[in-house]
């Protein structure tokens, strides 16, 4: 039976609302876990490691549910091959860098400035695509990147003028942006090793991360920090940590669902709008006062990102049309030759 327009609209609205709720909640929850005076645990790698452990456990139970309930067909059977885990290890190393620098950025920067601190992902996408894949970018896309860079620099300047900036947090944000770009590129390279299943790839990435984090935590002294943590036996602490891990896998699922019920373009626009609302919520919640130039820097970053999305979508659509036209012409010529 064909779905009515009203039912389809309600379903899309529900998915987008769920994406916004989970994404914004995850950012605020991670900020709370990483730098709240209530928690007082200076072990960001441990927090990130635990979320990876929770993700692996969640994928295990979701695979069991998938066997029992056929409508849950997104999650593959839980099976780990050490040969495959070793094969995707380079990608897992980039994945560890991505989530580590992301959380370190959030720990050292306010939620309101977090989007600006992480805004260079698009710029690194263009750079890495050219350097690694040898693919050039149109001048329109480069202009969009220039706007993003301008917004980033203005934001850093304005945040610095307020005396609240952490330049280490900015550096972590830049490194996180680089790792996000590298992760996207290497995902395409390694996903065939897991039968092109993004959830199986997430399983192997998080499985490898559980072990890759251990020497890093030992090197930075976080194991001792956790061992002497006064709230280690607190049920509330572990509840918040576990919720953070569950939300981590939930955002992956709801992101894929939002793309499925809308489109990649709509998903990116939704993400940009969500970032704007998240910034306003943070400024309001923490009672922050920002200058007009600070708001302008955010607008430049968000506007440049949205414009880049539109430009790339238009270019991909045009390239697809040209390729389809060439294929049709080739088929016609082939048919005439056979006649």
UniProtKB/Swiss-Prot annotation:
UniProt cross-references to InterPro entries, sorted A to Z: Sugar_P_trans_dom (IPR004853), TPT_transporter (IPR050186)
GO process annotations (BP): GDP-fucose import into Golgi lumen
Catalytic activity: GMP(out) + GDP-beta-L-fucose(in) = GMP(in) + GDP-beta-L-fucose(out)
Membrane topology qualifier: Multi-pass membrane protein
Lineage: superkingdom: Eukaryota
Basic and acidic residues bias locations: 325-339
Region listing for Disordered, in residue ranges: 319-339
Keyword vocabulary terms for this entry: Golgi apparatus, Membrane, Sugar transport, Transmembrane, Transmembrane helix, Transport
Localization per record: Golgi apparatus membrane
GO cellular component labels: Golgi apparatus; Golgi membrane
GO molecular function per UniProt: antiporter activity; GDP-fucose transmembrane transporter activity
Residue stretches spanning the membrane: 9-29, 45-65, 82-102, 111-133, 136-156, 165-185, 209-229, 237-257
Family (UniProt): Belongs to the TPT transporter family. SLC35C subfamily.
The protein's role, per its UniProt record: Antiporter specific for GDP-l-fucose and depending on the concomitant reverse transport of GMP. Involved in GDP-fucose import from the cytoplasm into the Golgi lumen.
Name of the molecule in the record: GDP-fucose transporter 1
Name of the gene this protein is made from: slc35c1
